């Protein structure tokens, strides 16, 4: 009996959070997008969620600047895929805590639903993985891998601007996850309506759920952070 192998993404974060192995179909026909649940050839994967345990809600300081986003995030974590906040689109300038908040949601999902597969990935890493899958002639494996995620967190989604093929594959992943009741969490430096270089069909989907902004902290919140 073959042991499952581990899929890891480069990270300096040490985490005790683990996903259960997931089954993904392999050796699929090229240039086809099929239902992954009916394709033969299954391999067990261990998926590293890539969540930094320091980025929890416990360590996330709440203030007027982030109250809506945090409340929505906690609602999503309590019932991933089961709220109107799907996707949850968190936006704001760099350094305001988008990564922390998005990972806090993932951490809470894992705490409350250990059986769910959670994955955090930066949009640039997603792009790199997709390019590598094309180079290695296994695009469908890439597609089916992401279609197996229960809660998918894509950080800095605006970095897919101008990357048409990557946007196309993400469009199919988004549709599959949304239609099967899985949770999507996206972060960006701008609200959906202001995104440049992103296909309109994606922007319209980004607006299906809730867009919540993170603002610069007020004095009271800055004091709490200190």
Language model feature labels by segment:
Residues 110, 115-151, 164:
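Short glycine-rich substrate-engagement loop in P-loop NTPases that contacts/grips substrate
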Residues 152-154, 185:
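Walker B beta-strand of ABC/ABC-like P-loop ATPase nucleotide-binding domains
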Residues 131-135, 192-208:
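Short regulatory helix/loop adjacent to the ATP-binding pocket of P-loop NTPases
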Residues 1-119, 124, 183, 189, ...:
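Intrinsically disordered, low-complexity basic tails and flexible linkers associated
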Residues 155-157, 189:
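Walker B catalytic acidic pair
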Residues 172-173, 177-200:
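Sensor-1/coupling segment of RecA-like P-loop NTPase cores
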Residues 158-171, 195-198:
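Conserved ATPase-coupling elements of RecA-like P-loop NTPase cores
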């Amino acid at each position: 009996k073959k042991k499952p192998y581990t899929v890891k993404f480069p990270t300096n974060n040490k985490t005790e959070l683990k996903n259960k192995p997931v089954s993904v179909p392999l050796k699929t026909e090229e240039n086809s997008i099929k239902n992954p649940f009916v394709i033969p050839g299954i391999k067990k994967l261990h998926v590293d969620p890539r969540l930094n345990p320091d980025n929890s809600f416990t360590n996330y300081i709440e203030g007027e600047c982030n109250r809506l986003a945090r409340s929505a995030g906690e609602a999503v974590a309590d019932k991933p895929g089961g709220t109107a906040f799907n996707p949850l689109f968190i936006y704001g300038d760099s350094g305001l805590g988008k990564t922390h908040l998005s990972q806090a949601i993932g951490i809470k999902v894992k705490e409350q639903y250990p059986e769910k597969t959670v994955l955090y990935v930066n949009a640039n890493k997603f792009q790199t993985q997709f390019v590598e899958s094309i180079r290695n002639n296994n695009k469908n494996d890439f597609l089916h891998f992401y279609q197996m995620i229960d809660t998918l967190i894509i950080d800095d989604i605006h970095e897919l601007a101008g990357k048409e093929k990557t946007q196309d594959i993400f469009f199919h992943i988004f549709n599959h996850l949304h239609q099967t009741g899985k949770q999507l969490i996206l972060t960006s430096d701008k609200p959906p309506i202001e995104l440049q270089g992103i296909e309109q069909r994606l922007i319209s989907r980004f607006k299906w759920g809730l867009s919540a902004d993170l603002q610069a902290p007020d004095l009271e919140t800055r004091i709490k952070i200190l």
